[in-house]
């Protein structure tokens, strides 16, 4: 059966905020958390008008009158001050300058190493033999123990020339010989021999052409 045109369907009336006006309070409600009176009534996002929603400016929290407390903080905090930005920028600049100084210090180390290598090279090239390096660490230029150009006969229990308590008396051939190089021991000639009596090693020098 068709409905009559004059008959209208009942429409549902949406609740409005006029039915629940905000409470007229002489003084704002204190915050239930911090007891601060810097609170306000929330006109927006106040879905349950039977429990009006409030906001505390001190602790930045919402709460509903007659409801439970919410521990959810307000999103989107305040902007950072310019002083904090300047402080962070200065800290970054200081760290970058310190890192550059460290790099500068490390680049100066190879120069010192090259100088020491050059010094050692000059010492080797100046003496001209490996035996000269043995006397670099001694206090008297290698004259104590015969590690350099010195003879060191007494310190090594060999004795000077003319001392008969040792046994074989080495005779150095010439005036420029080293401790380990002698020219003649008891008639042995034509080569170089070690000066120690128990470690006599002869090195024959044959004229090979």
Curated annotation (Swiss-Prot):
One of its GO terms (cellular component) is nucleus. Residues 89-116 have a biased composition (Low complexity). It holds the Pfam family Zn_ribbon_Dof. Residues 20-29 have a biased composition (Pro residues). It is found in: Nucleus. Signal peptide: none annotated. It comes from the Eukaryota. Transcription factor that binds specifically to a 5'-AA[AG]G-3' consensus core sequence. This is Dof zinc finger protein DOF1.6. It comes from Arabidopsis thaliana. The lineage of its organism: Eukaryota, Viridiplantae, Streptophyta, Embryophyta, Tracheophyta. The gene is DOF1.6.
